[in-house]
Design a protein with these regions (language model features):
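Linear, non-domain "peripheral" regions
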Residues: 1-148
């Protein structure tokens, strides 16, 4: 039976990514959820490949993500748009992680999303998931600083 190792920073990053999506799952429309699932799938697949122009491709996709989320939010700049934008950019940042040093910005972005979600959404499930993200981020940063 496989054991869950909370000090494995790659596993923590994936769990934080899933929790980040689940925080906003109930607060966005179906079309935005479909876009997030596609972006999540892309992030997981791209992280597994290592090719030369990964950051360039992610940058182009980030610009497209900003535009697509703007259109999905009825071309309105609102707090929902910016919180959705943070989640989209977290997905793209996860796909760019290659080295241990790249995990720091990802962890801080997840904490920012969790705190923003706590301010924006006050339901119990969202608050619990935000707490899980913050707790996992602390464990994640601790495991990144460990030397073996």
């Amino acid at each position: 039976m496989p054991r869950v190792n909370l000090l494995n920073y790659n596993f923590n990053a994936l769990v934080m990514l899933v929790c980040s999506y689940l925080v906003l799952f109930s607060e966005v429309e179906i079309s935005t959820n479909v876009f997030f699932v596609i972006l999540f799938s892309f992030a997981v697949i791209q992280k597994s490949f290592n090719y030369k122009y990964k950051k360039l491709f992610s940058s182009i996709l980030a610009i497209a993500t900003i535009y697509i989320l703007f259109v999905l939010n009825d071309q309105t700049l609102s707090k929902e748009y910016f919180i959705n934008l943070i989640l989209g950019l977290i997905f793209l940042k996860y796909s760019e992680i290659e080295k241990k040093e790249n995990h720091y910005f990802f962890g801080f972005s997840c904490v920012f999303l969790a705190v923003s979600s706590l301010i924006y959404g006050q339901d119990l499930i969202s608050s619990f998931l935000s707490f899980i993200i913050i707790l996992l981020s602390i464990i994640h940063l601790y495991s990144l600083n460990q030397t073996k």
